[in-house]
Amino acid sequence: MRTYILFITLLCTLSLKAQIVDCTPSKPTGDDEVTVTFDLTKCSFQKASLVDFEGPIYSHMGVITSESPSGTEWKSRIALWPDKTTPDKCNIDAVKLQKVGDNLWQLKITPSVKEFFMQNTQMEPPYEFKADEQLLSIEFVLRNADGTMDGRATGDKKSNIKLLLSHTIAPGEDSPRPEGVQRGINYHNDESLTLVLFAPGKQFAYLMSELSNWEVKEDYRMKRDGDYFWITLNHLIPGKEYAFYYLVDGLLDIADPYANKILERKFDKGISPVAYPNLMEFPEKCKADIVSVWQTAKPEYPWEVTDFKGVRQDRLTIYELLLRDFTRNGEYKGNLKLALEKLDYLKSLGINAIELMPFCKIDGITNWGYHSTFFFATEKVYGTEEDYKKFIDECHKRGIAVIMDIVLDHAYGTCSLVRLYADPPGNTKAQPAADNPWFNMVSPNTKYSWGADFNHESKETQILLDSICAFWLKEYKLDGFRFDFSKGFTNTPGDGSAYDPDRIRIIKRLSDEIRKRKSDAYLIYEHLAGDQEEKELAEHDLMLWGKQNSPFSNAINGVQKGSSFKGAMASSKGWSKNNRVTYMESHDEERVAYNASVNGIGEIRTELEAVSYTHLRAHETVLD
Protein backbone atom coordinates (compact mmCIF):
# COMPACT_ATOMS: atom_id res chain seq x y z
CA MET A 1 0.00 0.00 0.00
CA ARG A 2 1.13 3.55 -0.76
CA THR A 3 -0.05 6.44 1.41
CA TYR A 4 -0.84 9.79 -0.18
CA ILE A 5 -2.49 12.99 0.95
CA LEU A 6 -5.80 13.52 -0.80
CA PHE A 7 -6.62 17.19 -1.26
CA ILE A 8 -10.29 18.00 -1.77
CA THR A 9 -10.76 21.17 -3.81
CA LEU A 10 -13.42 23.52 -2.46
CA LEU A 11 -15.07 26.76 -3.44
CA CYS A 12 -12.85 28.82 -1.17
CA THR A 13 -14.09 32.09 0.21
CA LEU A 14 -10.53 33.28 0.80
CA SER A 15 -7.11 32.04 -0.17
CA LEU A 16 -4.83 31.16 2.73
CA LYS A 17 -2.44 34.02 2.00
CA ALA A 18 -5.09 36.73 1.85
CA GLN A 19 -6.03 36.90 5.54
CA ILE A 20 -4.41 33.97 7.36
CA VAL A 21 -0.76 34.86 7.17
CA ASP A 22 0.43 31.64 8.73
CA CYS A 23 -0.99 28.19 9.26
CA THR A 24 0.97 25.42 10.95
CA PRO A 25 1.08 22.86 9.44
CA SER A 26 0.73 24.58 6.08
CA LYS A 27 -1.43 21.74 4.74
CA PRO A 28 -3.41 20.48 7.74
CA THR A 29 -5.63 17.43 7.93
CA GLY A 30 -8.60 16.89 10.21
CA ASP A 31 -6.37 14.83 12.49
CA ASP A 32 -3.75 17.56 13.01
CA GLU A 33 -3.27 20.15 15.71
CA VAL A 34 -3.42 23.47 13.86
CA THR A 35 -2.17 26.96 14.72
CA VAL A 36 -3.61 29.83 12.68
CA THR A 37 -2.41 33.44 12.64
CA PHE A 38 -4.68 36.25 11.40
CA ASP A 39 -3.65 39.68 10.09
CA LEU A 40 -6.41 42.14 11.02
CA THR A 41 -5.20 44.68 8.47
CA LYS A 42 -6.32 42.31 5.71
CA CYS A 43 -9.86 41.87 7.00
CA SER A 44 -12.97 43.68 5.86
CA PHE A 45 -15.53 44.71 8.45
CA GLN A 46 -19.32 44.67 8.37
CA LYS A 47 -19.37 46.46 11.70
CA ALA A 48 -16.64 48.39 13.53
CA SER A 49 -13.04 47.60 12.60
CA LEU A 50 -10.84 45.35 14.71
CA VAL A 51 -7.66 46.97 13.40
CA ASP A 52 -5.54 48.20 16.36
CA PHE A 53 -8.12 46.73 18.77
CA GLU A 54 -6.42 45.49 21.94
CA GLY A 55 -8.85 42.67 22.63
CA PRO A 56 -10.20 40.38 23.64
CA ILE A 57 -10.91 38.81 20.22
CA TYR A 58 -12.87 35.62 19.69
CA SER A 59 -13.54 33.41 16.69
CA HIS A 60 -17.00 32.38 15.55
CA MET A 61 -16.20 29.24 13.55
CA GLY A 62 -17.57 26.16 11.85
CA VAL A 63 -16.50 23.13 9.85
CA ILE A 64 -17.66 21.99 6.41
CA THR A 65 -17.66 18.24 5.85
CA SER A 66 -18.55 15.71 3.18
CA GLU A 67 -22.01 15.65 4.76
CA SER A 68 -22.64 19.36 4.11
CA PRO A 69 -25.55 19.26 1.61
CA SER A 70 -24.61 22.39 -0.35
CA GLY A 71 -20.87 22.19 0.19
CA THR A 72 -21.05 25.36 2.33
CA GLU A 73 -23.18 24.40 5.35
CA TRP A 74 -21.45 24.19 8.75
CA LYS A 75 -22.03 20.73 10.20
CA SER A 76 -20.50 21.68 13.56
CA ARG A 77 -19.88 25.13 15.00
CA ILE A 78 -18.26 26.71 18.04
CA ALA A 79 -19.03 29.96 19.86
CA LEU A 80 -22.49 31.20 19.00
CA TRP A 81 -22.92 34.87 18.15
CA PRO A 82 -23.35 37.11 21.24
CA ASP A 83 -26.71 38.53 20.18
CA LYS A 84 -28.21 35.05 19.99
CA THR A 85 -27.21 33.51 23.32
CA THR A 86 -25.69 34.29 26.69
CA PRO A 87 -22.00 35.30 26.86
CA ASP A 88 -20.95 32.09 28.57
CA LYS A 89 -21.82 30.16 25.40
CA CYS A 90 -19.94 32.41 22.99
CA ASN A 91 -16.93 33.97 24.75
CA ILE A 92 -15.22 30.71 25.64
CA ASP A 93 -11.49 30.24 26.11
CA ALA A 94 -11.22 27.67 23.32
CA VAL A 95 -11.90 30.33 20.66
CA LYS A 96 -10.15 33.26 22.35
CA LEU A 97 -7.22 34.48 20.24
CA GLN A 98 -3.81 35.46 21.58
CA LYS A 99 -2.09 38.63 20.40
CA VAL A 100 1.32 37.81 18.91
CA GLY A 101 2.20 41.12 17.19
CA ASP A 102 0.79 44.36 15.84
CA ASN A 103 -2.65 43.38 14.49
CA LEU A 104 -1.54 39.74 14.48
CA TRP A 105 -3.69 37.32 16.47
CA GLN A 106 -3.36 33.57 16.87
CA LEU A 107 -5.70 30.65 17.52
CA LYS A 108 -4.62 27.11 18.44
CA ILE A 109 -6.93 24.26 17.41
CA THR A 110 -6.02 21.30 19.60
CA PRO A 111 -5.63 18.34 20.04
CA SER A 112 -6.94 17.95 16.46
CA VAL A 113 -9.51 19.68 14.30
CA LYS A 114 -12.07 16.93 14.79
CA GLU A 115 -11.52 16.65 18.56
CA PHE A 116 -11.60 20.45 18.89
CA PHE A 117 -15.09 20.64 17.41
CA MET A 118 -16.32 17.62 19.34
CA GLN A 119 -15.11 19.03 22.69
CA ASN A 120 -16.13 22.67 22.29
CA THR A 121 -19.32 22.83 20.24
CA GLN A 122 -22.35 24.57 21.76
CA MET A 123 -24.75 22.84 19.39
CA GLU A 124 -27.62 21.06 21.11
CA PRO A 125 -27.48 18.19 20.68
CA PRO A 126 -23.75 18.14 19.85
CA TYR A 127 -23.01 17.11 16.28
CA GLU A 128 -21.50 13.63 16.02
CA PHE A 129 -19.19 13.01 13.09
CA LYS A 130 -19.83 9.82 11.16
CA ALA A 131 -17.04 7.26 10.93
CA ASP A 132 -16.45 7.92 7.23
CA GLU A 133 -17.25 11.65 7.30
CA GLN A 134 -14.52 13.80 5.80
CA LEU A 135 -13.61 17.20 7.24
CA LEU A 136 -13.05 19.54 4.31
CA SER A 137 -12.80 23.12 5.53
CA ILE A 138 -12.79 25.37 8.61
CA GLU A 139 -14.37 28.83 8.37
CA PHE A 140 -13.83 31.76 10.73
CA VAL A 141 -15.35 35.14 11.58
CA LEU A 142 -13.39 37.17 14.17
CA ARG A 143 -15.22 39.46 16.62
CA ASN A 144 -15.02 41.30 19.89
CA ALA A 145 -16.81 40.08 23.02
CA ASP A 146 -20.25 41.54 22.25
CA GLY A 147 -20.13 41.12 18.47
CA THR A 148 -20.19 44.85 17.66
CA MET A 149 -16.82 44.59 15.90
CA ASP A 150 -15.91 41.86 13.43
CA GLY A 151 -13.36 40.84 10.85
CA ARG A 152 -13.82 38.63 7.84
CA ALA A 153 -12.60 38.15 4.29
CA THR A 154 -12.86 40.81 1.63
CA GLY A 155 -16.41 40.91 0.32
CA ASP A 156 -17.97 40.15 3.74
CA LYS A 157 -17.22 36.45 3.46
CA LYS A 158 -15.72 34.16 6.05
CA SER A 159 -12.04 33.31 6.04
CA ASN A 160 -11.33 29.74 5.17
CA ILE A 161 -8.73 26.98 5.60
CA LYS A 162 -8.83 23.99 3.26
CA LEU A 163 -8.14 20.69 4.96
CA LEU A 164 -6.25 17.77 3.53
CA LEU A 165 -7.64 14.32 4.03
CA SER A 166 -5.39 11.38 4.83
CA HIS A 167 -6.22 8.38 2.69
CA THR A 168 -4.49 5.14 1.96
CA ILE A 169 -4.45 4.69 -1.80
CA ALA A 170 -3.94 1.19 -3.12
CA PRO A 171 -1.74 0.80 -6.18
CA GLY A 172 -3.80 1.33 -9.30
CA GLU A 173 -4.18 -1.19 -12.07
CA ASP A 174 -1.51 -1.06 -14.75
CA SER A 175 -3.07 -1.85 -18.09
CA PRO A 176 -2.26 -0.94 -21.70
CA ARG A 177 -4.51 1.58 -23.42
CA PRO A 178 -6.98 0.27 -25.98
CA GLU A 179 -5.47 0.19 -29.44
CA GLY A 180 -5.78 3.39 -31.44
CA VAL A 181 -6.86 5.78 -28.69
CA GLN A 182 -5.38 9.28 -28.55
CA ARG A 183 -5.00 11.86 -25.80
CA GLY A 184 -8.34 13.31 -24.79
CA ILE A 185 -11.83 11.97 -25.54
CA ASN A 186 -12.08 8.93 -27.82
CA TYR A 187 -15.61 8.08 -28.98
CA HIS A 188 -16.24 4.43 -29.84
CA ASN A 189 -19.98 4.41 -30.47
CA ASP A 190 -23.14 6.13 -29.25
CA GLU A 191 -22.76 4.67 -25.75
CA SER A 192 -19.04 4.20 -25.20
CA LEU A 193 -15.83 6.22 -25.04
CA THR A 194 -12.32 6.15 -23.61
CA LEU A 195 -10.73 9.09 -21.80
CA VAL A 196 -6.95 9.39 -21.97
CA LEU A 197 -4.85 11.76 -19.84
CA PHE A 198 -1.14 12.25 -20.51
CA ALA A 199 0.45 13.08 -17.14
CA PRO A 200 4.06 11.88 -16.79
CA GLY A 201 5.32 11.70 -13.22
CA LYS A 202 1.85 11.68 -11.65
CA GLN A 203 0.83 8.83 -9.38
CA PHE A 204 -2.90 8.32 -9.86
CA ALA A 205 -6.00 9.93 -11.35
CA TYR A 206 -9.75 9.67 -10.83
CA LEU A 207 -12.58 10.58 -13.17
CA MET A 208 -14.95 12.99 -11.45
CA SER A 209 -18.43 13.38 -12.94
CA GLU A 210 -22.09 12.83 -12.24
CA LEU A 211 -21.38 9.13 -12.77
CA SER A 212 -19.47 9.17 -9.47
CA ASN A 213 -21.76 11.78 -7.92
CA TRP A 214 -18.69 14.05 -8.06
CA GLU A 215 -17.01 11.92 -5.41
CA VAL A 216 -13.81 9.87 -5.38
CA LYS A 217 -14.85 6.32 -6.16
CA GLU A 218 -12.66 3.36 -6.96
CA ASP A 219 -14.88 2.40 -9.89
CA TYR A 220 -13.71 5.60 -11.58
CA ARG A 221 -10.06 5.33 -10.80
CA MET A 222 -8.20 5.51 -14.10
CA LYS A 223 -5.91 2.71 -15.21
CA ARG A 224 -2.26 3.53 -15.72
CA ASP A 225 -0.17 2.88 -18.81
CA GLY A 226 3.28 4.42 -18.35
CA ASP A 227 2.82 8.20 -18.60
CA TYR A 228 -0.88 7.82 -19.39
CA PHE A 229 -4.06 7.35 -17.37
CA TRP A 230 -7.19 6.06 -19.05
CA ILE A 231 -10.70 4.80 -18.46
CA THR A 232 -13.34 3.33 -20.77
CA LEU A 233 -16.99 4.13 -20.08
CA ASN A 234 -19.95 2.16 -21.39
CA HIS A 235 -23.74 2.44 -21.24
CA LEU A 236 -23.72 6.21 -21.66
CA ILE A 237 -26.89 8.02 -22.75
CA PRO A 238 -26.54 8.88 -26.45
CA GLY A 239 -26.52 12.60 -27.15
CA LYS A 240 -26.33 13.61 -23.49
CA GLU A 241 -23.69 16.11 -22.36
CA TYR A 242 -21.65 14.98 -19.35
CA ALA A 243 -19.40 17.39 -17.47
CA PHE A 244 -16.22 15.94 -16.00
CA TYR A 245 -12.71 16.57 -14.74
CA TYR A 246 -9.72 14.57 -13.56
CA LEU A 247 -8.57 14.54 -9.93
CA VAL A 248 -4.82 13.96 -10.19
CA ASP A 249 -2.75 12.79 -7.20
CA GLY A 250 -5.67 13.79 -4.98
CA LEU A 251 -4.62 17.41 -5.39
CA LEU A 252 -5.30 18.77 -8.87
CA ASP A 253 -8.68 19.19 -10.52
CA ILE A 254 -7.95 19.26 -14.25
CA ALA A 255 -10.37 19.69 -17.14
CA ASP A 256 -9.38 17.61 -20.15
CA PRO A 257 -6.93 19.78 -22.15
CA TYR A 258 -8.10 18.17 -25.41
CA ALA A 259 -11.84 18.69 -24.80
CA ASN A 260 -13.89 20.57 -27.38
CA LYS A 261 -16.18 22.18 -24.82
CA ILE A 262 -15.33 23.77 -21.47
CA LEU A 263 -17.66 24.98 -18.71
CA GLU A 264 -16.59 27.63 -16.20
CA ARG A 265 -18.37 28.33 -12.94
CA LYS A 266 -17.29 31.98 -12.91
CA PHE A 267 -17.78 33.05 -16.52
CA ASP A 268 -20.58 30.98 -18.04
CA LYS A 269 -23.22 33.06 -16.31
CA GLY A 270 -22.06 36.02 -18.44
CA ILE A 271 -22.76 34.24 -21.74
CA SER A 272 -25.85 35.52 -23.55
CA PRO A 273 -28.53 32.91 -24.32
CA VAL A 274 -28.94 34.67 -27.65
CA ALA A 275 -25.36 33.78 -28.58
CA TYR A 276 -25.43 30.32 -26.99
CA PRO A 277 -28.96 28.97 -26.41
CA ASN A 278 -29.52 26.18 -23.89
CA LEU A 279 -25.98 26.20 -22.56
CA MET A 280 -25.44 23.34 -20.15
CA GLU A 281 -25.55 24.58 -16.57
CA PHE A 282 -22.44 24.24 -14.46
CA PRO A 283 -22.94 21.17 -12.22
CA GLU A 284 -23.89 22.26 -8.71
CA LYS A 285 -22.17 19.41 -6.87
CA CYS A 286 -18.89 19.76 -8.74
CA LYS A 287 -16.00 20.94 -6.56
CA ALA A 288 -13.84 22.17 -9.46
CA ASP A 289 -14.33 25.56 -11.11
CA ILE A 290 -13.56 24.48 -14.68
CA VAL A 291 -14.81 21.26 -16.26
CA SER A 292 -14.77 19.63 -19.68
CA VAL A 293 -17.69 18.05 -21.52
CA TRP A 294 -18.15 14.86 -23.53
CA GLN A 295 -21.16 14.00 -25.67
CA THR A 296 -21.62 10.75 -27.56
CA ALA A 297 -23.83 10.61 -30.66
CA LYS A 298 -23.26 14.29 -31.28
CA PRO A 299 -24.91 15.38 -34.55
CA GLU A 300 -22.49 16.03 -37.41
CA TYR A 301 -22.58 19.47 -38.99
CA PRO A 302 -23.97 19.18 -42.57
CA TRP A 303 -21.27 21.00 -44.55
CA GLU A 304 -22.53 22.52 -47.80
CA VAL A 305 -19.05 23.31 -49.12
CA THR A 306 -16.63 20.42 -48.82
CA ASP A 307 -14.05 21.32 -51.46
CA PHE A 308 -13.37 25.03 -50.99
CA LYS A 309 -10.33 26.39 -52.78
CA GLY A 310 -9.13 29.85 -51.84
CA VAL A 311 -7.24 32.33 -54.00
CA ARG A 312 -3.51 32.15 -54.50
CA GLN A 313 -1.85 33.45 -51.34
CA ASP A 314 -0.32 36.48 -53.07
CA ARG A 315 -3.88 37.53 -54.03
CA LEU A 316 -5.31 37.58 -50.52
CA THR A 317 -7.30 40.62 -49.37
CA ILE A 318 -7.87 39.99 -45.67
CA TYR A 319 -10.39 41.49 -43.25
CA GLU A 320 -9.37 41.13 -39.58
CA LEU A 321 -12.50 40.56 -37.50
CA LEU A 322 -13.03 40.56 -33.73
CA LEU A 323 -16.40 38.94 -33.15
CA ARG A 324 -16.83 40.70 -29.83
CA ASP A 325 -16.86 44.20 -31.34
CA PHE A 326 -17.88 43.64 -34.96
CA THR A 327 -21.61 43.50 -34.19
CA ARG A 328 -21.64 44.71 -30.62
CA ASN A 329 -24.51 47.23 -30.93
CA GLY A 330 -22.98 49.46 -28.26
CA GLU A 331 -21.97 46.56 -26.01
CA TYR A 332 -19.33 43.83 -26.08
CA LYS A 333 -21.91 41.32 -27.24
CA GLY A 334 -20.97 40.58 -30.81
CA ASN A 335 -21.59 37.00 -31.86
CA LEU A 336 -21.48 34.65 -34.82
CA LYS A 337 -25.17 34.89 -35.67
CA LEU A 338 -24.90 38.67 -36.05
CA ALA A 339 -21.64 38.38 -37.98
CA LEU A 340 -23.34 36.03 -40.44
CA GLU A 341 -25.72 38.83 -41.36
CA LYS A 342 -22.76 40.99 -42.40
CA LEU A 343 -21.05 38.53 -44.75
CA ASP A 344 -22.57 39.99 -47.90
CA TYR A 345 -21.44 43.45 -46.77
CA LEU A 346 -17.91 42.15 -46.22
CA LYS A 347 -17.98 40.47 -49.62
CA SER A 348 -18.96 43.80 -51.19
CA LEU A 349 -15.77 45.37 -49.82
CA GLY A 350 -13.76 43.18 -52.15
CA ILE A 351 -12.23 40.90 -49.54
CA ASN A 352 -11.55 37.22 -50.17
CA ALA A 353 -10.46 36.18 -46.67
CA ILE A 354 -11.50 36.82 -43.08
CA GLU A 355 -8.97 36.50 -40.29
CA LEU A 356 -10.93 35.73 -37.14
CA MET A 357 -9.16 37.00 -34.06
CA PRO A 358 -8.52 34.16 -31.57
CA PHE A 359 -11.56 32.10 -30.72
CA CYS A 360 -10.01 29.22 -28.78
CA LYS A 361 -11.26 29.11 -25.19
CA ILE A 362 -9.76 32.07 -23.37
CA ASP A 363 -9.18 33.12 -19.77
CA GLY A 364 -12.35 35.19 -19.26
CA ILE A 365 -14.87 36.11 -21.94
CA THR A 366 -14.33 39.75 -22.93
CA ASN A 367 -10.72 40.16 -24.04
CA TRP A 368 -9.26 40.08 -27.57
CA GLY A 369 -8.62 36.35 -27.36
CA TYR A 370 -4.87 36.27 -26.80
CA HIS A 371 -5.28 34.75 -23.30
CA SER A 372 -5.71 31.19 -24.58
CA THR A 373 -6.36 28.34 -22.16
CA PHE A 374 -7.98 25.41 -23.99
CA PHE A 375 -6.69 25.02 -27.53
CA PHE A 376 -9.23 22.48 -28.82
CA ALA A 377 -12.35 24.28 -27.55
CA THR A 378 -14.20 27.25 -29.02
CA GLU A 379 -15.01 30.36 -27.01
CA LYS A 380 -18.69 29.96 -26.11
CA VAL A 381 -19.40 33.67 -25.67
CA TYR A 382 -19.62 34.01 -29.48
CA GLY A 383 -21.78 30.96 -30.12
CA THR A 384 -21.97 27.20 -30.38
CA GLU A 385 -19.59 24.90 -32.21
CA GLU A 386 -22.24 24.62 -34.93
CA ASP A 387 -22.35 28.44 -35.22
CA TYR A 388 -18.61 28.53 -35.91
CA LYS A 389 -18.94 25.86 -38.58
CA LYS A 390 -21.90 27.57 -40.20
CA PHE A 391 -19.99 30.87 -40.31
CA ILE A 392 -17.06 29.17 -42.05
CA ASP A 393 -19.40 27.30 -44.40
CA GLU A 394 -21.21 30.52 -45.36
CA CYS A 395 -17.88 32.27 -45.93
CA HIS A 396 -16.82 29.48 -48.27
CA LYS A 397 -20.11 29.74 -50.17
CA ARG A 398 -19.17 33.36 -50.89
CA GLY A 399 -15.62 32.57 -51.94
CA ILE A 400 -14.19 33.88 -48.66
CA ALA A 401 -11.44 31.92 -46.92
CA VAL A 402 -11.33 31.83 -43.11
CA ILE A 403 -7.96 32.17 -41.38
CA MET A 404 -7.69 31.47 -37.66
CA ASP A 405 -5.65 33.85 -35.53
CA ILE A 406 -4.07 31.56 -32.96
CA VAL A 407 -1.72 32.02 -30.01
CA LEU A 408 0.91 29.30 -29.74
CA ASP A 409 3.69 31.10 -27.91
CA HIS A 410 2.00 31.16 -24.50
CA ALA A 411 -1.03 30.05 -22.46
CA TYR A 412 -2.66 31.42 -19.34
CA GLY A 413 -2.82 29.94 -15.85
CA THR A 414 -6.24 28.28 -16.03
CA CYS A 415 -4.92 26.10 -18.86
CA SER A 416 -4.87 22.49 -17.62
CA LEU A 417 -1.42 21.92 -19.12
CA VAL A 418 -0.07 24.79 -17.01
CA ARG A 419 -1.90 23.86 -13.80
CA LEU A 420 -0.97 20.19 -14.00
CA TYR A 421 2.70 21.12 -13.57
CA ALA A 422 2.69 24.49 -11.82
CA ASP A 423 4.74 25.60 -8.83
CA PRO A 424 2.81 25.34 -6.52
CA PRO A 425 0.62 22.70 -8.21
CA GLY A 426 -2.76 23.84 -9.47
CA ASN A 427 -2.17 27.52 -8.76
CA THR A 428 -3.52 29.59 -11.68
CA LYS A 429 -1.09 32.43 -10.91
CA ALA A 430 2.01 30.28 -10.47
CA GLN A 431 4.81 29.79 -12.95
CA PRO A 432 5.30 26.38 -14.61
CA ALA A 433 7.30 23.86 -12.61
CA ALA A 434 10.62 22.48 -13.82
CA ASP A 435 9.01 19.18 -14.84
CA ASN A 436 6.30 20.76 -17.02
CA PRO A 437 6.49 18.91 -20.37
CA TRP A 438 5.14 21.87 -22.38
CA PHE A 439 6.20 25.15 -20.77
CA ASN A 440 9.37 26.93 -19.73
CA MET A 441 9.63 27.87 -16.07
CA VAL A 442 10.46 31.43 -17.16
CA SER A 443 10.18 32.97 -20.61
CA PRO A 444 13.57 33.41 -22.31
CA ASN A 445 12.30 36.67 -23.82
CA THR A 446 13.54 39.53 -21.66
CA LYS A 447 11.12 42.10 -23.10
CA TYR A 448 7.96 40.44 -24.38
CA SER A 449 6.21 37.65 -22.53
CA TRP A 450 2.70 36.79 -21.40
CA GLY A 451 1.33 33.99 -19.27
CA ALA A 452 3.22 30.68 -19.38
CA ASP A 453 5.77 30.45 -22.19
CA PHE A 454 5.65 27.40 -24.46
CA ASN A 455 8.91 25.48 -24.66
CA HIS A 456 9.09 25.09 -28.44
CA GLU A 457 12.14 22.83 -28.21
CA SER A 458 10.15 20.26 -26.24
CA LYS A 459 9.01 17.23 -28.20
CA GLU A 460 5.77 17.26 -26.23
CA THR A 461 5.09 20.87 -27.21
CA GLN A 462 5.67 20.01 -30.86
CA ILE A 463 3.27 17.06 -30.63
CA LEU A 464 0.69 19.31 -29.00
CA LEU A 465 0.96 22.15 -31.53
CA ASP A 466 0.80 19.73 -34.46
CA SER A 467 -2.37 18.24 -32.96
CA ILE A 468 -3.94 21.65 -32.41
CA CYS A 469 -3.41 22.78 -35.99
CA ALA A 470 -4.52 19.44 -37.45
CA PHE A 471 -7.72 19.54 -35.39
CA TRP A 472 -8.87 22.97 -36.59
CA LEU A 473 -8.06 22.25 -40.23
CA LYS A 474 -10.01 18.98 -40.21
CA GLU A 475 -12.89 19.63 -37.82
CA TYR A 476 -13.65 23.23 -38.85
CA LYS A 477 -12.36 23.20 -42.45
CA LEU A 478 -10.28 26.30 -41.78
CA ASP A 479 -8.06 27.55 -44.57
CA GLY A 480 -5.02 28.51 -42.54
CA PHE A 481 -3.58 30.30 -39.54
CA ARG A 482 -2.17 33.63 -38.51
CA PHE A 483 0.33 32.87 -35.72
CA ASP A 484 0.53 35.57 -33.09
CA PHE A 485 3.97 36.69 -31.90
CA SER A 486 5.93 34.01 -33.73
CA LYS A 487 9.03 35.84 -32.57
CA GLY A 488 8.38 33.96 -29.32
CA PHE A 489 8.72 30.51 -30.93
CA THR A 490 12.19 30.02 -29.44
CA ASN A 491 14.15 29.33 -26.27
CA THR A 492 16.93 31.71 -27.27
CA PRO A 493 17.39 34.38 -24.55
CA GLY A 494 16.90 38.02 -25.48
CA ASP A 495 14.20 40.33 -26.78
CA GLY A 496 13.65 38.31 -29.96
CA SER A 497 15.02 40.90 -32.37
CA ALA A 498 18.30 39.14 -33.23
CA TYR A 499 18.65 36.62 -36.04
CA ASP A 500 17.72 33.22 -34.59
CA PRO A 501 18.38 30.06 -36.63
CA ASP A 502 16.72 27.92 -33.96
CA ARG A 503 13.51 29.90 -34.32
CA ILE A 504 13.64 29.50 -38.11
CA ARG A 505 14.03 25.74 -37.67
CA ILE A 506 11.10 25.57 -35.25
CA ILE A 507 8.78 27.58 -37.50
CA LYS A 508 9.71 25.60 -40.61
CA ARG A 509 9.09 22.32 -38.78
CA LEU A 510 5.61 23.41 -37.64
CA SER A 511 4.73 24.75 -41.10
CA ASP A 512 5.87 21.59 -42.84
CA GLU A 513 3.76 19.45 -40.50
CA ILE A 514 0.70 21.57 -41.24
CA ARG A 515 1.22 21.32 -44.98
CA LYS A 516 1.45 17.55 -44.74
CA ARG A 517 -2.21 17.74 -43.74
CA LYS A 518 -3.27 20.66 -45.96
CA SER A 519 -0.81 21.51 -48.69
CA ASP A 520 -2.43 24.85 -49.58
CA ALA A 521 -2.91 26.12 -46.01
CA TYR A 522 -2.38 29.86 -45.61
CA LEU A 523 0.38 30.30 -43.02
CA ILE A 524 0.88 33.86 -41.83
CA TYR A 525 3.37 34.71 -39.09
CA GLU A 526 3.29 37.90 -37.03
CA HIS A 527 7.06 37.83 -36.92
CA LEU A 528 8.20 41.45 -37.19
CA ALA A 529 11.83 40.34 -36.93
CA GLY A 530 14.95 41.28 -38.89
CA ASP A 531 15.10 41.24 -42.69
CA GLN A 532 17.44 38.23 -42.95
CA GLU A 533 15.22 35.99 -40.85
CA GLU A 534 12.00 37.10 -42.53
CA LYS A 535 13.54 36.54 -45.96
CA GLU A 536 14.42 32.94 -45.07
CA LEU A 537 10.87 32.30 -43.92
CA ALA A 538 9.39 34.01 -46.99
CA GLU A 539 11.54 31.85 -49.25
CA HIS A 540 10.05 28.83 -47.43
CA ASP A 541 6.72 30.08 -48.85
CA LEU A 542 5.50 31.44 -45.52
CA MET A 543 3.70 34.77 -45.29
CA LEU A 544 4.93 37.51 -42.94
CA TRP A 545 2.95 40.37 -41.47
CA GLY A 546 4.15 43.69 -42.88
CA LYS A 547 3.25 46.62 -40.67
CA GLN A 548 2.72 49.84 -42.67
CA ASN A 549 0.53 51.83 -40.32
CA SER A 550 2.88 54.82 -40.11
CA PRO A 551 3.36 55.34 -43.88
CA PHE A 552 -0.37 55.10 -44.57
CA SER A 553 -1.24 57.35 -41.62
CA ASN A 554 1.31 59.95 -42.71
CA ALA A 555 -0.02 59.87 -46.26
CA ILE A 556 -3.65 60.41 -45.28
CA ASN A 557 -2.62 63.06 -42.75
CA GLY A 558 -0.89 65.06 -45.48
CA VAL A 559 2.59 64.46 -44.03
CA GLN A 560 5.11 63.80 -46.80
CA LYS A 561 7.95 62.57 -44.62
CA GLY A 562 7.66 58.87 -43.85
CA SER A 563 4.78 58.34 -46.28
CA SER A 564 6.52 56.11 -48.81
CA PHE A 565 4.78 52.82 -49.56
CA LYS A 566 7.99 51.15 -50.66
CA GLY A 567 8.10 48.99 -47.53
CA ALA A 568 4.76 47.45 -48.47
CA MET A 569 6.37 45.56 -51.32
CA ALA A 570 8.06 42.19 -50.84
CA SER A 571 10.60 43.17 -53.49
CA SER A 572 11.82 46.00 -51.26
CA LYS A 573 12.99 43.32 -48.83
CA GLY A 574 14.83 41.36 -51.50
CA TRP A 575 12.30 38.52 -51.40
CA SER A 576 11.83 36.47 -54.54
CA LYS A 577 8.31 35.48 -53.45
CA ASN A 578 5.48 37.92 -52.83
CA ASN A 579 4.74 36.71 -49.30
CA ARG A 580 4.40 40.02 -47.47
CA VAL A 581 0.99 40.60 -45.85
CA THR A 582 0.99 44.38 -45.79
CA TYR A 583 -1.51 46.12 -43.54
CA MET A 584 -2.28 49.72 -42.74
CA GLU A 585 -4.44 48.82 -39.71
CA SER A 586 -4.69 45.94 -37.25
CA HIS A 587 -5.96 45.38 -33.73
CA ASP A 588 -2.63 46.75 -32.43
CA GLU A 589 -2.62 49.93 -34.55
CA GLU A 590 -4.66 53.11 -34.50
CA ARG A 591 -7.28 53.56 -37.22
CA VAL A 592 -5.88 55.79 -39.95
CA ALA A 593 -9.11 57.78 -40.36
CA TYR A 594 -9.33 58.50 -36.64
CA ASN A 595 -5.65 59.40 -36.58
CA ALA A 596 -6.32 61.86 -39.41
CA SER A 597 -9.17 63.45 -37.46
CA VAL A 598 -6.71 64.24 -34.68
CA ASN A 599 -3.39 64.74 -36.48
CA GLY A 600 -4.32 65.60 -40.05
CA ILE A 601 -3.09 68.87 -41.59
CA GLY A 602 -5.59 71.63 -42.37
CA GLU A 603 -8.60 70.53 -44.39
CA ILE A 604 -7.71 66.88 -43.92
CA ARG A 605 -8.78 67.23 -40.32
CA THR A 606 -11.72 69.58 -40.91
CA GLU A 607 -13.07 67.92 -44.08
CA LEU A 608 -12.29 64.38 -43.00
CA GLU A 609 -15.22 62.56 -44.60
CA ALA A 610 -14.52 63.69 -48.17
CA VAL A 611 -10.75 63.49 -47.85
CA SER A 612 -10.83 60.08 -46.14
CA TYR A 613 -12.89 58.57 -48.93
CA THR A 614 -10.43 59.73 -51.57
CA HIS A 615 -7.32 58.75 -49.63
CA LEU A 616 -8.62 55.40 -48.43
CA ARG A 617 -9.68 54.41 -51.94
CA ALA A 618 -6.16 55.22 -53.05
CA HIS A 619 -4.72 53.10 -50.23
CA GLU A 620 -7.02 50.25 -51.25
CA THR A 621 -5.48 50.41 -54.72
CA VAL A 622 -1.98 50.23 -53.26
CA LEU A 623 -2.85 47.21 -51.11
CA ASP A 624 -4.74 45.34 -53.82
Model-derived segments and their meaning:
Residues 152-170:
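Short beta-strand elements
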Residues 40-49:
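Short amphipathic, basic-aromatic surface patches that mediate peripheral association
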Residues 261-270, 299-300, 304-316, 322-477, ...:
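Substrate-binding/active-site clefts of carbohydrate-active enzymes
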Residues 615-624:
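Single conserved hydrophobic/aromatic residue that forms the stacking wall/gate
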Residues 168-205, 260-314:
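Basic K/R-rich, polyanion-interacting modules in nucleoproteins and related proteins
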Residues 226, 360, 368-371, 485-583:
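Active-site-proximal helices and loops of the catalytic beta/alpha 8
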Residues 1-21:
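Bacterial Sec-dependent N-terminal signal peptides
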Residues 51, 56-132, 147-155, 188-189, ...:
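Aromatic-rich carbohydrate-binding modules that target alpha-glucans
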